[in-house]
């Protein structure tokens, strides 16, 4: 039998990992270990990293495709998205980053996504979010979850994979997708191809902005960002970029929006956020955007759970 190299995975073993992940919907209280062992998770990281590097940093994709925003470890909501849209490979998917941190099940979330990436490399796509970065997920929960359930060593293996994620995608030359937004350093989409990987996310510059910037209706041109990182950009910058690059729409995530999706700049930009009841603190819906062959966009909504009254 052929030896499985670092860049491949036994198909039966991969299918078994996916089966266990789909079985493991709600862990019992006090369950320490996930349904996977550390060496299996490490293998998911190593093999997916190879695939990310084999594919371009600016993905060129075709419709029809379904696009999802932030998940943030809300594993049961990720499974709801697949129930709505169809489990891979019945539909093609693009995720816009922020798979880990804040939610309770970052490990299940990222493991299922990496497993699907390995199984369906030409039908399932993952972009990098600002939380797929060691300095951020060290603080906001993923490091602690890895350490508590497995080891710090495993967190470092995830970091190696995250440092190779692509940062943007273009759908049929007309829809530009990224996690955060535009950059004053970005005039031509082709520039994204020049970002070298593996790389950490720097504190400023093109890669930082693609993962961190936000649209703002109150700004003309470029403005300060309340996050303390990157910029905000006005509707004028969206229109200018689309005209210059002969595109129709910018699709991004990165911000909680009440209905799960929200248009900006005369529907030239859309924000998609896919974690309903974000952190248990918001009453937002989650959404998934379906792009059909003619590039018509429609939305599937995950309604927030009904809040239980605290006092009767």
UniProtKB/Swiss-Prot annotation:
As its record notes, the protein acts as a catalyst of: O-phospho-L-seryl-[protein] + H2O = L-seryl-[protein] + phosphate; O-phospho-L-threonyl-[protein] + H2O = L-threonyl-[protein] + phosphate
Known cofactor(s): Mn(2+)
Q: How is the cofactor bound?
A: Binds 2 manganese ions per subunit.
Any single Gene Ontology cellular-component annotation? protein phosphatase type 1 complex
- Where is it mostly found? nucleus
EC number(s) stated in the UniProt entry for this protein = 3.1.3.16
Q: Which residues form the active site?
A: 131 (proton donor)
* Compartmental location: Nucleus; Cytoplasm
Q: Per the UniProt entry, what is one GO biological process? A: protein dephosphorylation
Classify the source by domain of life. Eukaryota
InterPro entries cross-referenced by the UniProt entry:
Calcineurin-like_PHP_ApaH (IPR004843), Metallo-depent_PP-like (IPR029052), PP1_catalytic_subunit (IPR050341), Ser/Thr-sp_prot-phosphatase (IPR006186), STPPase_N (IPR031675)
User: Which key words are in the record?
Assistant: Acetylation, Cytoplasm, Hydrolase, Manganese, Metal-binding, Nucleus, Protein phosphatase
Record's signal peptide: none
Q: Which residues carry this modification: N-acetylalanine?
A: 2
UniProt cross-references to PROSITE patterns, sorted A to Z: SER_THR_PHOSPHATASE
Alphabetically, the GO molecular function entries are: metal ion binding; protein serine/threonine phosphatase activity
Under the heading Pfam families, the entry gives: Metallophos, STPPase_N
Q: Where does Mn(2+) 2 bind?
A: 98, 130, 179, 254
Give the quaternary structure. Interacts with SRK2D/SNRK2.2 and SRK2E/SNRK2.6.
Q: Which family does it belong to?
A: Belongs to the PPP phosphatase family. PP-1 subfamily.
Role according to the record: Serine/threonine-protein phosphatase that possesses phosphatase activity toward para-nitrophenyl phosphate (pNPP) in vitro.
**Protein name, entry field:** Serine/threonine-protein phosphatase PP1 isozyme 2
Q: Please name the source species.
A: Arabidopsis thaliana (Mouse-ear cress)
This protein's encoding gene: TOPP2
């Amino acid at each position: 039998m052929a030896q499985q190299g670092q860049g491949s995975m036994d198909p039966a073993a991969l299918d078994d990992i996916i089966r266990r992940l789909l079985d493991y919907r709600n862990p019992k209280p006090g369950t320490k270990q996930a349904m996977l062992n550390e060496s299996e998770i490490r293998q998911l990281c190593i093999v997916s990293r190879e695939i990310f590097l084999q594919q371009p940093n600016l993905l060129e994709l075709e419709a029809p495709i379904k696009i999802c925003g932030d998940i943030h470890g809300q594993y049961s909501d990720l499974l709801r998205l697949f129930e709505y849209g169809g489990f891979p490979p019945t539909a093609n998917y693009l995720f816009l980053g922020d798979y880990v941190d804040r939610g309770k099940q970052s490990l299940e979330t990222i493991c299922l996504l990496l497993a699907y990436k390995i199984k369906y490399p030409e039908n399932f796509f993952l972009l990098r979010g600002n939380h797929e970065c060691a300095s951020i997920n060290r603080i906001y929960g993923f490091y602690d979850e890895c350490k508590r359930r497995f080891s710090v060593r495993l967190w470092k293996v995830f970091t190696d994979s995250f440092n190779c994620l692509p940062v943007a995608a273009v759908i049929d030359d007309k829809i530009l997708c990224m996690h955060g937004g535009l950059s004053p350093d970005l005039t031509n989409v082709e520039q994204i191809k020049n970002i070298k990987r593996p790389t950490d996310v720097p504190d400023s510059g093109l890669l930082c902005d693609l993962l961190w910037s936000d649209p703002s209706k109150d700004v003309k041109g470029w403005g300060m960002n309340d996050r303390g990182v990157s910029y905000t950009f006005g509707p004028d910058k969206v229109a200018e970029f689309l005209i210059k690059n002969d595109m129709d729409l910018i699709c991004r995530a990165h911000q909680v929006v009440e209905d799960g999706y929200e248009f900006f700049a005369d529907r030239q930009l859309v924000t998609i956020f896919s974690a309903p009841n974000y952190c248990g603190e918001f009453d937002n819906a989650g959404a998934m955007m379906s792009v059909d062959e003619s590039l018509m966009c429609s939305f599937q909504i995950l309604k927030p759970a009904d809040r239980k009254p605290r006092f009767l």
